[in-house]
Amino acid sequence: GCDRHGQLCLHRVNVAPQYGDSFYDYVSDVNAVLSEAARRVVAEEGPFDLIHTHDWLTCGAATELKHATKRPLVGTIHATERGRGRGQLYGQQAERINTTEWQLSYESWRVICCANYMAGEIHDYFGTPADKIDVIPNGVDPTPFQALEGQDLSEVRQRYAGPHDRIVFFVGRLVHEKGVETLVRSAPAVLAAVPQARYVIAGRGPESEHLGHVVQELGVSNRVLLAGFIRDDVRNRLFRLSDCAVFPSLYEPFGIVALEAMASHCPVVVSEVGGLREVVRHAETGITIYPGDADSCAWGIRHTLEQREWARQRAQNAYREVLTTYSWDNIAAQTARVYERVVRERSATLW
């Protein structure tokens, strides 16, 4: 059966939890299960117009279904394995993932990605023709953030910071590519200029133990909190409370978390990398900094904390942009136009 939500019909497929040493082999097994389930849906519910899949993880099932049904495939590529490795492929699994990403770009009638930066990466790494790629950004729903307008957030503030602290907030996975060590290493310079700064770093990941050591080494453990995992509702409240949100990524195909901060009227400081440099315009909707550069990061945070009126104006500009460019209605309309084009072109083509 399926879960119906208006015009959306969602078929849930039970798959085994991850097993074995090879994640790639596990994903291949899951694709076999998904493919079989999809064929059943096709048999029961009749023909459909197109297939849309996201990233290499479901490429196998989507490609198989495409050839079995002679229906066009649209592929969204959010990030690439080579990009995550800063242009390198480390090990056999990375090479297999890279090959599957190439296959998805090859098999797709149109390829969607979320930033011009990613369009360049897909073109360079996979030889995908530039005119086969559509750039449609990710979006954010501002409603949960708007709902906090005027609410008492003192309980959350007491949990994470003092009454007069200036909160510098990060939320995300604690992995190397997010550049969190750069943020931690910016703390001494920021605290020298703004002693009431309070870093709240939320998230889990393989870097968390190392980051704890860096905090100790720098002697800033009384002003830098590694908060661990936080729920979305707590994250939203921290965005509202924070004086700035910092995303110092080394690799970032898009950076939806920056949009969430912007939807909260929170001033942002982000690395000038990947999709982040398209989401945030320096000195207009945020501050951009050099990736991997703690001095640059400290400058961006200090500027935001010290120049409150400028920061407020940038946050206002950013919020307006969220409501227009990054609204889901706008993104849905762009996606529908891609679908219409694919269906039109397929109808005029012999398979």
Task: For the regions a language model picked out, list residue spans one by one.
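Conserved donor-binding/catalytic core segment of Leloir-type glycosyltransferases
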Residues: 162-178, 184-187
